[in-house]
Amino acid sequence: MTVVIGLTGGIASGKSTVSQMFRELSIPVIDADIIAREVVEKGKPAYNKIVEVFGTEVLQEDGELDRPKLGSVVFYNEEKRLQLNKIVHPAVREEMNRRKEMYIKEGMQAVVLDIPLLFESKLTSLVDRVLVVAVKPHTQLERLMKRNNFSEEEATARIQSQMPLEEKVKNADEVINNDGTIMGTKTQLQAILKKWNIID
């Protein structure tokens, strides 16, 4: 029986570190962000639909999607943002499901769906267990400022635009506290996977 794990966290909580640890344990990871880029590649159904709805002005000269341009179109327009999500989200969900089923057919012990907005996009039904990577608020703020070269105001605004991390923690099956060392994080992950009978 394959255990489907939903991996999520807050911005700059260190989710990609944990994602990499799963890969090192030979547990396949399906990354929602990568799939979201793939489903809008030139010629794909979602791409065609975007061009139909938003016009060719959201394309680069080579015909590929101009993501920053599309981003600025939907950023200030709630209706257009919802239109875009209506096109992209189902395509991402379908592709994630397809890959998940493939790993289940292969008899994998576990498969990870790495979804930053797992709760916000109401995708918890796709997974059996939810694992949240959490950090203390000041750690999150410091990491985000350092990683993205943000001012404190910018970083705070970005953090506040997401569901609060403590709310995600409340809804998790297990939580990894990622404030300490890489080794400490790895130890926590291994303990959780043992508890779930995924590794010995």
Swiss-Prot record:
GO terms for biological process: coenzyme A biosynthetic process. Belongs to the CoaE family. It comes from Bacillus thuringiensis subsp. konkukian (strain 97-27). Residues 4-200 form the DPCK domain. One of its GO terms (cellular component) is cytoplasm. Coiled coil: none annotated. Catalyzes the phosphorylation of the 3'-hydroxyl group of dephosphocoenzyme A to form coenzyme A. The keyword Acyltransferase does not apply. Transmembrane segments: none annotated. Its EC number is 2.7.1.24. The keyword Cell membrane does not apply. It is found in: Cytoplasm. It holds the Pfam family CoaE. This is Dephospho-CoA kinase. InterPro entries: Depp_CoAkinase, P-loop_NTPase. ATP binds at residues 12-17. Keywords: ATP-binding, Coenzyme A biosynthesis, Cytoplasm, Kinase, Nucleotide-binding, Transferase. It catalyses: 3'-dephospho-CoA + ATP = ADP + CoA + H(+). GO terms for molecular function: ATP binding; dephospho-CoA kinase activity. Pathway: Cofactor biosynthesis; coenzyme A biosynthesis; CoA from (R)-pantothenate: step 5/5. The gene is coaE.
